[in-house]
Amino acid sequence: MIRQFFSVLIGSFVVTASMMHALTPAEKKIADEARSRYYNLQASGFESLTCDVSYDLNSAPFSGLPSSLKESLSLARVTLKINDRGIPTVNKQLPTSIQKDTFDQATQMLNVMSSLVEGVFQTWPTKGFFGPIPPFDNQINAIKTTPEGYVFDLNVPGAPVLIRTDKNFVTTQITSVGGRVLEKTIYSPSDKGLVFTGNGALSKRDAEAPIEVDYHLDTQVLDGMIVPAGVHVTVKPNIDARYTLTSCKILRSAVIQVK
């Protein structure tokens, strides 16, 4: 269920540059101003981030596990790597020294643990890598002014995505999949712009019970760049998990300003 729900968020918010559309001069001005409000990790020269993932095994769904199984999981190694496009790769490994009677159970739980990392960070690029507004104008179908602020209609094959902002371009709501997926993002101020620090998503699928996911991100500064440091993710009603990113290594390239 976890992977299925996060895949809905990923699929509903993959922008494409193939559907050409020219913004009007007024729309382009709005788009440029909106982008400037958000911290752009990509523009800072980000190349990659590699971290170990350390889980709080006293958080759900791990807290009720037998102590022997929790001990086995504490020996597992999970790593997260985010590349220069913001795309994550999660690797996981259990030591072969774990007793056979707990190895299969530990493997099953490790899959759950890694899915909580994959799910969050597969949805992260379109909100946290360069902000919620796509970097290219042809990824935006139209921009409308509303009494509350603005609505950005994105070019997404099969399922339009609408991003609503206030008059200061702070995102207040994202709707997708024909209005069946509703997201409310959290952006926190910094001296480099608004930084993505959380998301609440509700999926109301036909003939299925609604699924609600919330996650909050702690951040850290590495080599002058603001990147994730930890996650608190809840999937109602039975997951309330926490993990931190440790031993992080970051690579960056020189940014050349073209005048």
Residue ranges and their predicted role:
Residues M1-L9:
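Bacterial N-terminal signal peptides that target proteins for export
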Residues V8-A17:
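Bacterial N-terminal signal peptides
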Residues A17-S59:
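N-terminal leader/targeting segments and the immediate start of mature chains
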Residues E33, F129-I140, G179-L182, A209-E212:
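A short, amphipathic edge element
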Residues Q42, K70-E71, V78-K81, F136-T145, ...:
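Short, exposed beta-strand/loop patches in secreted or surface proteins that constitute
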Residues S59-S68, L202-E208:
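Flexible, membrane-facing loop/turn or short amphipathic-helix motifs
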Residues S74-P132, N155, P160-L162, V177-G178:
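An acidic-aromatic
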Residues G149-K259:
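Gly/Pro-enriched, hydrophobic low-complexity segments
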